[in-house]
Amino acid sequence: MPYSHSHILQNAITPIKSHQKPNNINLIYHTTPHRGLQILYPVFTELCKKYPDIHLDVYSSFKIYGWEQRDEPFKPLFEELKKHPNITYHGSVSNGKIREALQKAHIFAYPSIWQETSCIALIEAMSAGCICVHPNYAALPETSGGWTSMYHWDEAPNIHANRFYAYLDGAVKHILQHGMPYMENQKFYTDTMYSWDKRSKEWEQFLGNFG
């Protein structure tokens, strides 16, 4: 189909209400496993040697799409996650549960290897006031609007993992030394840019062209 015959409308979310983060540092990964979970696990394991009190919540399964069979290649990784004392593997849960978890999370740890065209997981984490650590890959720079902790992506897994570790280390260190940074500007941008109020008006205008 010619590009001139298409029309792009961005994603939208219901903003996550303002809240206080808990004292213990929590990281979260809440997207499907093929997007970078295999990089996150060893990096987090290494990070725990330096920060033994951090915790990672993993909400990840193709079951959310009804494709549970696609979890098969990742089951050994899921088992490793379950064994780790600093990781809780939750599998697939409702978006309501994810939004609750984001309110308790300090860092969205997302070493993406997937060519996103947009990323609702990132948008919701930004709205929740999380420090979002991710590469400048595909549409993530556009989605984040420059408000996140973004590093240069590399196709080599070891290089990617090392850069991801460095940025995660910096985020954890900042929280320990200075407390959770002021994220209201990030939240304001996200809640304004990706609000349903804004997006519904765009849809009304778009659909009005066919009236």
Describe the predicted segments one by one:
Residues I131-H134, P141:
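Short hydrophobic beta-strand element within catalytic cores of glycosyltransferases
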